[in-house]
């Protein structure tokens, strides 16, 4: 039974313990003891889980880096699960998303775990859900970054409370957005790189004009915003 709690001061020893727990889940996932441990974490208090998804190169990692900084300034603890694609030939993965995160080495209230998607479909990894269950019992906020996705990778909706879908400026017209199945899952649509002002503004306008066609299961009024991780613009609004 883990003694970790979101109410205690999180130390480097706790980070090591958390890493060991996640490793145990990976190696011994189907064992009764591991399932009991997950049940224990599932009953604890829960942080808010945010999913960040979108096509490759849209700027998800850079935006998450800014979000982490903003949350830490407001004294929220943050856990991050960064899912990277795997090679179909070698089975390996370059776990490079975390290199975009500019995190203070001594900040024990931020924890980043990289994961390989392997052959799991849907934009996340097979162990994303159990890892999330553990981390949301410890951190105020958990951010899950999906692999770069296309039109049908929507599993991130099943493991998060809020989904942010990132859109590249000038990446397509309204019809392209409407064709995409993934446009049905976000709570927030975020146009990245808004320092490309004209392109960004046009994309935001296109999305706003077709907003009535976007729906999600909760009948939530989908928010549309824009940010620039490069210039740190729009992050407070997001």
Regions flagged by a language model, labelled:
Residues 185-190, 194-237:
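Canonical P-loop GTPase G-domain recognition
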């Amino acid at each position: 039974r883990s003694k970790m709690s979101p109410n205690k001061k999180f130390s480097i020893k706790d980070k090591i313990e958390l890493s060991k727990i996640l490793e145990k889940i990976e190696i011994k996932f189907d064992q009764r003891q591991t399932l009991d441990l997950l049940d224990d974490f599932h009953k604890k208090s829960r942080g808010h889980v945010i999913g960040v998804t979108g096509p490759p190169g849209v700027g998800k990692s850079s935006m998450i880096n800014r979000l982490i900084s903003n949350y830490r300034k407001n004294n929220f603890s943050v856990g991050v699960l960064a899912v990277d694609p795997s090679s179909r030939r070698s089975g390996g993965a370059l776990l490079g998303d975390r290199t975009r995160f500019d995190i203070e080495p001594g900040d024990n209230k931020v924890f980043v775990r990289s994961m390989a998607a392997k052959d799991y479909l849907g934009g996340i990894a097979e162990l994303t859900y159990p890892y999330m269950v553990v981390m949301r019992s410890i951190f105020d906020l958990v951010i899950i970054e999906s692999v770069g996705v296309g039109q049908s990778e929507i599993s991130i909706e099943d493991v998060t409370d809020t989904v942010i879908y990132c859109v590249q400026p000038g990446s397509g017209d309204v019809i392209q957005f409407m064709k995409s199945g993934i446009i049905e899952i976000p709570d927030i649509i975020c146009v990245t790189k808004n320092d490309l002002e004209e392109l960004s503004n046009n994309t935001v306008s296109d999305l706003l004009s077709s907003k009535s066609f976007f729906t999600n299961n909760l009948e939530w009024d989908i928010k549309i915003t824009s940010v620039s991780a490069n210039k740190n613009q729009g992050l407070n609004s997001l």
